[in-house]
């Protein structure tokens, strides 16, 4: 009886349940848009409160926001370089904050308590469509960075230091977004599934330290994603000699 009950509970942990929105011939994952809008709205409110009354001696939310600004500035300067890092700070900062808030929102907010006609809510970054879209955005960004800074000379990168590297450099353009998207998706989805399984097995105590570990992992994944995005952009604008 216990085994049957346990298997029934595990069966409830389905992966890939979706609320679909049909717009013409396009079918969208509605739950991703809902959670993204909620989290982005919360982030905008947080930033608005922190910048409402700017003071020379920052404290509270303003102090936290200035710390994040300084951290993102240092990250962008280190990875992209002194020359153009300022142009890319808003992009890198937005990526970091969106991934961070999405990851933590999935770990802290009990989305499953909100009932939908079909599917269930969860972290936007636990959906492969979100992470692939973010990774493709990064790819377009470093192509744009290279072309806008070097023009057609950017394509010299593909044959540097020798033309033998051409097929490997082309392959790299495909593996970069794949690694970015699947790393983030896999880690966040795995964290949600592990916590879900433990809640079924021991719902009172054991899931709590695992949730704290998930929060730490989620923050690290946001940092890795933003750092790699900045690194790829820096690689695109770097002058080869």
Curated annotation (Swiss-Prot):
Its main location: membrane. InterPro entries: ATP_syn_F0_a_bact/chloroplast (IPR045082), ATP_synth_F0_asu (IPR000568), ATP_synth_F0_asu_AS (IPR023011), F0_ATP_A_sf (IPR035908). Keywords: ATP synthesis, CF(0), Hydrogen ion transport, Ion transport, Membrane, Thylakoid, Transmembrane, Transmembrane helix, Transport. F-type ATPases have 2 components, CF(1) - the catalytic core - and CF(0) - the membrane proton channel. CF(1) has five subunits: alpha(3), beta(3), gamma(1), delta(1), epsilon(1). CF(0) has four main subunits: a, b, b' and c. It is a multi-pass membrane protein. One of its GO terms (cellular component) is plasma membrane-derived thylakoid membrane. It comes from Prochlorococcus marinus (strain MIT 9215). The keyword Cell division does not apply. It is found in: Cellular thylakoid membrane. Belongs to the ATPase A chain family. NCBIfam families: ATP_synt_6_or_A (TIGR01131). The keyword RNA-binding does not apply. Pfam families: ATP-synt_A. Key component of the proton channel; it plays a direct role in the translocation of protons across the membrane. It comes from the Bacteria. The gene is atpB. This is ATP synthase subunit a.
